[in-house]
Amino acid sequence: MSLPLNNFKRALAEGKPQFGLWAALADAYVTELLATAGFDWLLIDNEHAPNDVRSTLAQLQAVAAYASHPVVRPVRSDSALIKQLLDIGAQTLLLPMIDTAEQAADAVAATRYPPQGIRGVGSALARASRWNRIPDYLNTAADELCVLVQVESVQGMENLSAIAAVDGVDGVFFGPSDLSASMGLLGKPGDASVREAIRNGIQTVLRAGKAAGVLAPDPAIAADYLEAGATFVAVGTDTGLLSRAAADLAASYKKTATMAASPKGGY
């Protein structure tokens, strides 16, 4: 039995654009459906969506047969949470609210076994090692792990060069909503000054030889960030897609019914 390859990590290293979708409905059936839609990656969100370890496990199992790569975001960058997510088989993590190089280094250390890091050894109980059926898992696991850190504050942007330079960080993801709030522009992630900060940040990350990512549901803004050099871009959320489609469908039928009930001219 072989260690699963992380083709998403390879794509980022090769600079191939990867388009993703937020999976926030916290349901394995929905996430499996999304995995058939053609996205390169899906973000299983534990920070703002009602997920836990078991629901995340179910979603990892649900998408395992498909090409869409699961990226898991814990509620915070915490070594115990990281250990649990890695043990259930997550190979790519998006770690939120990273403000300093020290925090980024701690995040990387949490994904590595000693002596390179502090990840606890429990491979006999872990789906990730296929319950010790993957030969030499302990020595090879890190080769297929992708560590993405999320920079989403003024402090993080000030420390961006140092964060991106941390060994073991594969990419930096910018969070426009929290960044805009930190800049005093709450609720304005598309503000020109926020976009300029992110464009400059993308260049900083690229100079460090790392991949840059961002959430950009607006096609024009997404195109702007891609032109700036972003590699992995989340272009929407499942909640947004469902909410808009449901509202549009209801509105279209109400409009049809209203037109049908309107008085008609005639004799």
Swiss-Prot record:
Keywords: Lyase, Metal-binding, Pyruvate
E.C. numbers: 4.1.2.-
Pfam families named in the record: HpcH_HpaI (PF03328)
Domain of life (superkingdom): Bacteria
Residues annotated as site: Increases basicity of active site His: 87
Required cofactor(s): a divalent metal cation
Any GO CC annotation of this UniProt entry: cytoplasm
One GO term of the biological process aspect: phenylacetate catabolic process
Residue positions of the active site: 48
Gene Ontology molecular function: any one: metal ion binding
Site (Transition state stabilizer): 73
Binding site for a divalent metal cation: 152, 178
Reaction(s) catalysed (UniProt annotation): D-glyceraldehyde + 3-hydroxypyruvate = 2-dehydro-D-galactonate; D-glyceraldehyde + 3-hydroxypyruvate = (3R,4S,5R)-3,4,5,6-tetrahydroxy-2-oxohexanoate; D-glyceraldehyde + pyruvate = 2-dehydro-3-deoxy-L-galactonate
Family in the record: Belongs to the HpcH/HpaI aldolase family.
PANTHER family associated with the record: 2-KETO-3-DEOXY-L-RHAMNONATE ALDOLASE, PHOSPHOENOLPYRUVATE CARBOXYLASE FAMILY PROTEIN
The protein's role, per its UniProt record: Aldolase which can catalyze in vitro the aldolisation reaction between hydroxypyruvate (HPA) or pyruvate (PA) and D-glyceraldehyde (D-GA). The condensation of hydroxypyruvate and D-glyceraldehyde produces 2-dehydro-D-galactonate as the major product and (3R,4S,5R)-3,4,5,6-tetrahydroxy-2-oxohexanoate. The condensation of pyruvate and D-glyceraldehyde produces 2-dehydro-3-deoxy-L-galactonate.
Descriptive protein name: Hydroxypyruvate/pyruvate aldolase Bphyt_5830
Organism: Paraburkholderia phytofirmans (strain DSM 17436 / LMG 22146 / PsJN)
Organism placement in taxonomy: Bacteria, Pseudomonadati, Pseudomonadota, Betaproteobacteria, Burkholderiales
